[in-house]
């Protein structure tokens, strides 16, 4: 029997009890109060209610090493990034790798692969695939349902996916940015139980009124805590915390779910409500096998120095200490010798500079970037002189943006984007939600072609090209992940970001923001297979 002492935070009874926890075979057998004084606190481990581990560019094992040190004990992972590239093979890779992680990783089945009929991904996940996957017992629900028109119009394939999950009485996550009114009612009635895309309080309250749970998101690209934080006091039982997408640099320096907990406590919200949102609410909603510091449950908890900064001293998972502040985690890469050539799909040939030409007349439509958001604006600009090839207009902060299918040799789609700040060079990425084709932004065609071709020749990664000088992070797993450890990746990532900032880019997370510029299921203007796509009308401008 193991005994752990400290100030035990009882969220259910809203009490802090000095005492000890008895653990046997990974289960809490008793909790005793002893009246002693302790300088540390025992709390339930944090739960991320919606995350795409692939967005960290790390495997589940390496991801777990970064978040456990922040008190995270479990995450609900939607593997739709790797599924868009490799389908069921990619999903199985994530599940198998997660078995060796330090935390509990639960999986939902990707619902929309590809995201829409307008996307071109490497693979499909059909209703038949979902039926096969759900029978495996490896999944706790259906991932974010992005095909809103499919639900509203009762598309047979979409509705069959939903019915398969409802048959098992499992939760279905939502993805409904700006959805309101009658369309929202139909969406909820289909069985959608959560949404993590709310950007305004009014939107969140309407969804709560219809029975949805709201996931307050604070990731590397989308940050909605400030807009939604009053829900912590008004609806503490209807909200959860999530990160959605975070890069390793932020996980190391800013934290994970703990950063929202610290912020909420600092903002004066009730400690027990905040901890409930970060721990108990996702456990109950998703039916997770995660302990919450009660007798008879698994011994899953964190020991923190205080209830202000929440510095993590140690973390226990099923009674075993998986992290200790004084013992460095093993960051050795155990998988470098693995042949992961079958874990990628890259059929694209390099492009020529001449393929990037685009003529413009006086007025152009631009994607308007908002730093800290993944939504964009539809903006109009006037160009003084018509051009047979407008590479950029730096005075107006207008750059060329290129979308290139990596699964087949189609012509590049070219448009313009405003709000990046870059004044020289170009950068590109094969992380491009959700189909993970190549997307690039640049000031001139020569550097654009260089950045794009660097990714093609290496079959995935992040690249910067400045007058021919290349900086690069290789991502050999599906063109979106690496087997390298989080510290190594964070160092390269930080170097790339510093370089982009030195080149004039003022976005806080340039690659993360760029990766969402092809996600056409997020408002308002994005770029895809046929050029610019307008979300509110759900069509390509070229189709008008």
Locate predicted features.
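Short coil/turn connectors at secondary-structure junctions
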Residues: 1, 38-44, 70-73, 100-105, ...
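Residue-level marker for buried hydrophobic side chains located in beta-strands
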Residues: 45-47, 107, 241, 441-444
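Active-site mouth loops of central-metabolism enzymes
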Residues: 47-59, 114-125, 193
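Active-site beta-loop-alpha junctions enriched in small/polar residues
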Residues: 52, 56, 80-82, 108-115, ...
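Histidine/acidic residue-rich metal-binding segments in metalloenzymes
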Residues: 124-144, 150-215, 222-241, 252-266, ...
């Amino acid at each position: 029997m193991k005994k752990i002492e400290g100030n035990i935070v009882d969220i259910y009874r809203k009490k802090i009890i000095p005492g000890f926890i008895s653990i046997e075979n990974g289960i809490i057998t008793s909790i005793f109060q002893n009246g002693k004084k302790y300088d540390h606190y025992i709390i339930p481990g944090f739960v991320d209610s919606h995350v795409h581990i692939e967005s960290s560019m790390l495997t589940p094992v390496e991801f777990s090493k970064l978040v456990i040190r922040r008190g995270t004990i479990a995450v609900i992972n939607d593997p739709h990034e790797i599924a868009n590239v490799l389908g069921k093979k990619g999903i199985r890779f994530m599940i198998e790798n997660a078995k060796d992680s330090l935390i509990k990783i639960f999986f939902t089945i990707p619902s929309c692969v590809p995201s829409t009929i307008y996307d071109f991904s490497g693979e499909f996940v059909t209703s038949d695939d979902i039926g096969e996957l759900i029978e495996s017992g490896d999944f706790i629900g259906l991932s974010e349902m992005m095909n809103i028109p499919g639900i509203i119009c009762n598309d047979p394939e979409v509705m069959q996916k939903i019915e398969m999950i409802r048959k098992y009485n499992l939760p279905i996550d939502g993805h409904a940015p700006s959805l309101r009114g009658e369309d929202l009612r139909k969406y909820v009635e289909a069985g959608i139980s959560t949404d993590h895309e709310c950007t305004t309080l009014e939107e969140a309250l309407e969804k709560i009124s219809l029975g949805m749970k709201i996931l307050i998101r604070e990731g590397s690209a989308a940050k909605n805590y400030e807009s939604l934080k009053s829900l912590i006091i008004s609806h503490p039982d209807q909200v959860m915390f999530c990160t959605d997408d975070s890069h390793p640099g932020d996980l190391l320096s800013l934290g994970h779910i703990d950063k929202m907990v610290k912020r909420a406590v600092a903002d004066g919200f009730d400690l027990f409500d905040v901890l409930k949102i970060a721990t108990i609410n996702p456990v109950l909603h998703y039916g997770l096998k995660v302990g919450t510091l009660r007798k008879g449950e698994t011994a899953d908890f964190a020991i923190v120095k205080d209830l202000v900064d929440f510095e993590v001293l140690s973390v226990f998972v099923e009674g075993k200490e998986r992290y200790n502040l004084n013992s460095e985690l093993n960051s050795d890469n155990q998988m470098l010798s693995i042949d992961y050539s079958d874990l990628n799909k890259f059929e694209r040939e390099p492009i020529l500079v001449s393929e990037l030409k685009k003529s413009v007349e006086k007025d152009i439509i631009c994607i308007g970037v908002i730093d800290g958001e993944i939504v964009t604006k539809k903006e109009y600009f006037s160009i003084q002189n018509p051009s047979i090839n407008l590479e950029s207009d730096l005075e107006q902060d207008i750059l060329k943006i290129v979308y290139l299918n990596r699964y087949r040799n189609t012509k590049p789609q070219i448009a313009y984007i405003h709000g990046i700040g870059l004044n020289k060079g170009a950068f590109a990425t094969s992380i491009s939600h959700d189909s993970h084709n190549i997307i690039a932004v640049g000031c001139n065609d020569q550097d654009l072609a260089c950045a794009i071709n660097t990714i093609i020749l290496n079959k995935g990664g992040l690249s910067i090209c400045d007058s021919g000088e290349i900086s690069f992070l290789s991502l050999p797993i599906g063109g979106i992940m690496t087997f390298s450890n989080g510290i190594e990746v964070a160092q390269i990532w930080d170097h790339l970001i510093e370089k982009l900032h030195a080149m004039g880019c003022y976005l806080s997370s340039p690659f993360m923001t760029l990766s969402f510029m092809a996600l056409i299921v997020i408002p308002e203007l994005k770029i895809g297979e046929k050029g610019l796509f307008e979300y509110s009308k759900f069509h390509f401008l070229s189709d008008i």
